[in-house]
Amino acid sequence: AETHAKYGTTSMVPTTLTCSDTELMNMFATYRKAKVLNTKGAKFIGLHLEGPYFSPKQSGAQDPIYLKKPQPEEYNAILESSEDIIRWSVAPELEGAIKMGHVLQEHHILPSIAHTDAIYEEVTQAYKAGYTHITHLYSAMSSVTRRNAFRYAGVVEAAYLIDDMTVEIIADGIHLPKPLLQFVYKFKGADKIALCTDAMRGAGMPDGESILGSLANGQKVIIEDGVAKMPDRSAFAGSVATTNR
Protein backbone atom coordinates (compact mmCIF):
# COMPACT_ATOMS: atom_id res chain seq x y z
CA ALA A 1 0.00 0.00 0.00
CA GLU A 2 2.85 2.39 0.81
CA THR A 3 4.59 1.62 -2.49
CA HIS A 4 1.43 2.33 -4.48
CA ALA A 5 0.85 5.55 -2.54
CA LYS A 6 4.27 6.78 -3.67
CA TYR A 7 3.06 6.51 -7.26
CA GLY A 8 -0.22 8.34 -6.77
CA THR A 9 -2.69 5.69 -5.63
CA THR A 10 -5.04 6.99 -2.94
CA SER A 11 -7.35 3.97 -2.59
CA MET A 12 -7.01 0.33 -3.54
CA VAL A 13 -9.07 -2.85 -3.56
CA PRO A 14 -6.98 -5.93 -2.71
CA THR A 15 -8.04 -8.79 -4.94
CA THR A 16 -7.98 -12.56 -4.50
CA LEU A 17 -7.29 -15.31 -7.03
CA THR A 18 -8.89 -18.73 -7.19
CA CYS A 19 -7.52 -20.62 -4.21
CA SER A 20 -8.40 -23.09 -1.48
CA ASP A 21 -10.96 -22.19 1.17
CA THR A 22 -8.21 -22.17 3.80
CA GLU A 23 -6.16 -19.65 1.85
CA LEU A 24 -9.22 -17.48 1.31
CA MET A 25 -9.97 -17.41 5.03
CA ASN A 26 -6.32 -16.55 5.72
CA MET A 27 -6.60 -13.70 3.25
CA PHE A 28 -9.66 -12.32 5.04
CA ALA A 29 -7.77 -12.38 8.35
CA THR A 30 -4.69 -10.77 6.82
CA TYR A 31 -6.80 -8.02 5.28
CA ARG A 32 -8.43 -7.19 8.61
CA LYS A 33 -5.00 -6.86 10.23
CA ALA A 34 -3.60 -4.85 7.32
CA LYS A 35 -6.45 -2.33 7.51
CA VAL A 36 -5.44 -1.51 11.07
CA LEU A 37 -1.69 -1.38 10.38
CA ASN A 38 -1.93 0.56 7.12
CA THR A 39 -1.58 4.18 8.20
CA LYS A 40 0.79 5.54 5.54
CA GLY A 41 -0.23 3.69 2.38
CA ALA A 42 -3.12 3.87 -0.07
CA LYS A 43 -6.41 3.31 1.74
CA PHE A 44 -7.97 -0.16 1.60
CA ILE A 45 -11.63 0.30 0.66
CA GLY A 46 -12.74 -3.33 0.41
CA LEU A 47 -12.02 -6.71 -1.11
CA HIS A 48 -12.58 -7.93 -4.66
CA LEU A 49 -12.95 -11.69 -5.03
CA GLU A 50 -11.91 -13.14 -8.39
CA GLY A 51 -13.31 -16.63 -8.67
CA PRO A 52 -13.47 -19.46 -8.02
CA TYR A 53 -16.63 -19.39 -10.15
CA PHE A 54 -14.98 -19.02 -13.55
CA SER A 55 -15.14 -20.80 -16.90
CA PRO A 56 -12.41 -23.43 -17.41
CA LYS A 57 -12.27 -22.27 -21.04
CA GLN A 58 -11.24 -18.78 -19.92
CA SER A 59 -9.13 -19.51 -16.85
CA GLY A 60 -6.22 -17.29 -17.91
CA ALA A 61 -3.71 -17.12 -15.05
CA GLN A 62 -6.25 -18.50 -12.55
CA ASP A 63 -5.42 -21.97 -11.21
CA PRO A 64 -7.92 -24.32 -12.94
CA ILE A 65 -7.74 -26.75 -10.02
CA TYR A 66 -10.02 -24.51 -7.97
CA LEU A 67 -12.56 -23.54 -10.63
CA LYS A 68 -16.13 -24.59 -9.86
CA LYS A 69 -19.81 -23.68 -10.20
CA PRO A 70 -21.47 -21.42 -7.61
CA GLN A 71 -23.11 -23.32 -4.77
CA PRO A 72 -25.30 -21.31 -2.34
CA GLU A 73 -24.02 -23.08 0.76
CA GLU A 74 -20.46 -22.29 -0.25
CA TYR A 75 -20.70 -18.64 -1.27
CA ASN A 76 -23.05 -17.85 1.61
CA ALA A 77 -20.45 -19.24 4.02
CA ILE A 78 -17.83 -17.01 2.41
CA LEU A 79 -20.11 -13.99 2.71
CA GLU A 80 -20.59 -14.75 6.41
CA SER A 81 -16.81 -14.93 6.87
CA SER A 82 -16.06 -11.39 5.74
CA GLU A 83 -17.85 -8.05 5.78
CA ASP A 84 -15.13 -6.48 3.64
CA ILE A 85 -16.18 -7.86 0.24
CA ILE A 86 -17.39 -5.10 -2.08
CA ARG A 87 -17.17 -6.90 -5.42
CA TRP A 88 -17.18 -10.49 -6.66
CA SER A 89 -16.25 -11.46 -10.21
CA VAL A 90 -18.04 -14.48 -11.68
CA ALA A 91 -18.60 -16.17 -15.05
CA PRO A 92 -22.36 -15.52 -15.44
CA GLU A 93 -23.06 -18.46 -17.75
CA LEU A 94 -22.27 -20.99 -15.02
CA GLU A 95 -25.17 -22.84 -13.43
CA GLY A 96 -26.15 -20.97 -10.27
CA ALA A 97 -24.50 -17.67 -11.24
CA ILE A 98 -27.77 -15.79 -11.80
CA LYS A 99 -29.06 -16.72 -8.35
CA MET A 100 -25.71 -15.71 -6.89
CA GLY A 101 -26.00 -12.30 -8.53
CA HIS A 102 -29.25 -11.63 -6.69
CA VAL A 103 -27.68 -12.74 -3.39
CA LEU A 104 -24.70 -10.43 -3.88
CA GLN A 105 -27.03 -7.52 -4.53
CA GLU A 106 -28.83 -8.24 -1.26
CA HIS A 107 -25.45 -7.94 0.47
CA HIS A 108 -24.69 -4.67 -1.37
CA ILE A 109 -21.83 -6.35 -3.23
CA LEU A 110 -21.22 -5.62 -6.91
CA PRO A 111 -21.53 -8.74 -9.10
CA SER A 112 -19.01 -8.43 -11.93
CA ILE A 113 -18.34 -10.46 -15.07
CA ALA A 114 -14.92 -12.04 -15.65
CA HIS A 115 -13.10 -15.13 -16.98
CA THR A 116 -16.18 -16.03 -18.95
CA ASP A 117 -17.20 -17.77 -22.16
CA ALA A 118 -20.74 -16.37 -22.11
CA ILE A 119 -22.64 -15.32 -25.21
CA TYR A 120 -24.64 -12.11 -25.56
CA GLU A 121 -27.95 -13.60 -24.42
CA GLU A 122 -26.37 -14.93 -21.22
CA VAL A 123 -24.80 -11.56 -20.48
CA THR A 124 -28.11 -9.72 -20.89
CA GLN A 125 -29.75 -12.17 -18.49
CA ALA A 126 -26.91 -11.65 -16.02
CA TYR A 127 -27.20 -7.87 -16.34
CA LYS A 128 -30.80 -8.10 -15.13
CA ALA A 129 -29.53 -10.09 -12.13
CA GLY A 130 -27.12 -7.34 -11.11
CA TYR A 131 -24.02 -8.05 -13.16
CA THR A 132 -23.62 -4.47 -14.32
CA HIS A 133 -19.84 -4.35 -14.51
CA ILE A 134 -17.18 -6.19 -16.51
CA THR A 135 -13.79 -6.93 -14.98
CA HIS A 136 -10.77 -6.48 -17.27
CA LEU A 137 -12.55 -6.06 -20.60
CA TYR A 138 -10.99 -8.18 -23.38
CA SER A 139 -8.96 -10.26 -20.90
CA ALA A 140 -10.03 -13.92 -20.61
CA MET A 141 -13.51 -13.47 -22.07
CA SER A 142 -15.49 -14.32 -25.17
CA SER A 143 -15.84 -12.22 -28.27
CA VAL A 144 -17.65 -13.33 -31.44
CA THR A 145 -17.70 -17.12 -31.35
CA ARG A 146 -18.99 -19.91 -33.57
CA ARG A 147 -21.05 -22.83 -32.33
CA ASN A 148 -22.29 -25.43 -34.78
CA ALA A 149 -21.59 -23.08 -37.70
CA PHE A 150 -23.63 -20.22 -36.18
CA ARG A 151 -21.94 -17.06 -34.95
CA TYR A 152 -22.80 -15.57 -31.56
CA ALA A 153 -21.88 -12.25 -29.99
CA GLY A 154 -19.84 -12.62 -26.83
CA VAL A 155 -19.13 -10.67 -23.67
CA VAL A 156 -17.09 -8.00 -25.44
CA GLU A 157 -19.93 -7.21 -27.83
CA ALA A 158 -22.44 -7.22 -24.96
CA ALA A 159 -20.29 -4.66 -23.16
CA TYR A 160 -20.83 -2.22 -26.02
CA LEU A 161 -24.46 -3.07 -26.76
CA ILE A 162 -25.67 -2.71 -23.16
CA ASP A 163 -25.46 1.05 -22.76
CA ASP A 164 -25.37 1.17 -18.96
CA MET A 165 -22.85 -1.66 -18.57
CA THR A 166 -19.66 -0.31 -17.03
CA VAL A 167 -16.31 -1.76 -18.01
CA GLU A 168 -12.92 -1.95 -16.37
CA ILE A 169 -9.74 -2.07 -18.43
CA ILE A 170 -6.15 -2.78 -17.47
CA ALA A 171 -4.61 0.47 -18.62
CA ASP A 172 -0.93 -0.43 -18.39
CA GLY A 173 -0.42 0.03 -22.14
CA ILE A 174 0.53 -3.63 -22.49
CA HIS A 175 -2.59 -5.70 -21.83
CA LEU A 176 -4.46 -3.60 -24.39
CA PRO A 177 -2.78 -1.68 -27.22
CA LYS A 178 -3.42 2.02 -27.69
CA PRO A 179 -5.91 1.63 -30.61
CA LEU A 180 -8.04 -0.73 -28.51
CA LEU A 181 -8.00 1.67 -25.56
CA GLN A 182 -9.14 4.42 -27.92
CA PHE A 183 -11.89 2.14 -29.25
CA VAL A 184 -13.23 1.46 -25.75
CA TYR A 185 -13.17 5.16 -24.90
CA LYS A 186 -14.90 6.14 -28.13
CA PHE A 187 -17.83 3.75 -27.74
CA LYS A 188 -18.32 3.58 -23.94
CA GLY A 189 -17.34 7.09 -22.89
CA ALA A 190 -15.39 8.17 -19.83
CA ASP A 191 -18.35 7.79 -17.44
CA LYS A 192 -18.69 4.06 -18.20
CA ILE A 193 -14.99 3.17 -17.94
CA ALA A 194 -12.85 2.35 -14.92
CA LEU A 195 -9.08 2.21 -15.35
CA CYS A 196 -7.14 -0.17 -13.14
CA THR A 197 -3.52 -1.24 -12.73
CA ASP A 198 -4.31 -4.91 -11.93
CA ALA A 199 -0.97 -4.82 -10.17
CA MET A 200 0.30 -7.97 -8.47
CA ARG A 201 3.09 -8.18 -5.88
CA GLY A 202 5.77 -7.57 -8.52
CA ALA A 203 4.83 -3.89 -8.79
CA GLY A 204 7.76 -1.72 -7.79
CA MET A 205 10.11 -4.72 -7.82
CA PRO A 206 12.94 -5.53 -10.26
CA ASP A 207 12.46 -7.95 -13.16
CA GLY A 208 12.72 -11.66 -12.44
CA GLU A 209 10.64 -14.43 -10.89
CA SER A 210 7.66 -13.65 -8.69
CA ILE A 211 4.56 -15.37 -7.32
CA LEU A 212 0.98 -14.71 -8.36
CA GLY A 213 -1.34 -15.49 -5.48
CA SER A 214 -0.29 -16.91 -2.12
CA LEU A 215 3.39 -17.40 -1.40
CA ALA A 216 2.68 -20.98 -0.35
CA ASN A 217 0.59 -22.18 -3.30
CA GLY A 218 0.61 -19.38 -5.85
CA GLN A 219 1.77 -19.62 -9.44
CA LYS A 220 5.29 -18.76 -10.49
CA VAL A 221 5.45 -15.90 -12.99
CA ILE A 222 8.12 -13.95 -14.81
CA ILE A 223 8.34 -10.16 -14.54
CA GLU A 224 9.74 -8.65 -17.74
CA ASP A 225 8.84 -6.05 -20.34
CA GLY A 226 6.80 -4.19 -17.74
CA VAL A 227 4.31 -7.00 -17.16
CA ALA A 228 3.90 -10.36 -15.39
CA LYS A 229 3.93 -13.41 -17.66
CA MET A 230 3.25 -17.10 -17.26
CA PRO A 231 6.52 -19.08 -17.12
CA ASP A 232 6.10 -20.29 -20.72
CA ARG A 233 5.36 -16.70 -21.75
CA SER A 234 2.14 -17.82 -23.43
CA ALA A 235 -0.03 -15.31 -21.56
CA PHE A 236 0.10 -12.35 -19.22
CA ALA A 237 -0.33 -13.07 -15.52
CA GLY A 238 -1.20 -9.66 -14.16
CA SER A 239 0.29 -6.22 -14.29
CA VAL A 240 3.12 -4.55 -12.40
CA ALA A 241 1.94 -1.06 -13.32
CA THR A 242 1.54 1.74 -10.82
CA THR A 243 -1.02 4.52 -11.14
CA ASN A 244 1.41 7.05 -12.59
CA ARG A 245 2.05 4.76 -15.56
Regions inferred by a protein language model and the residue ranges of each:
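Short helix-capping segments at alpha-helix termini
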Residues: 36-42, 81, 106-107, 188-189
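Active-site glycine- and acidic-residue-rich loops that bind
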Residues: 20-26, 93-95, 108-120, 170-183, ...
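Generic structural signal for well-ordered alpha-helices
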Residues: 1, 25-32, 75, 101, ...
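Short acidic, glycine/serine/threonine-rich loops at helix termini
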Residues: 24-27, 57-62, 100-101, 146-149, ...
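Surface-exposed amphipathic alpha-helices with a cationic face
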Residues: 32-35, 101-108, 185
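His/Asp/Glu-enriched, well-ordered alpha-helical/loop segment
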Residues: 151-169, 173, 185-245
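Divalent metal-dependent hydrolysis catalytic cores, especially in the metallo-beta-lactamase
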Residues: 1-27, 42-55, 82-93, 109-112, ...
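Divalent metal-binding pocket/active-site signature
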Residues: 49, 56-72, 77-153
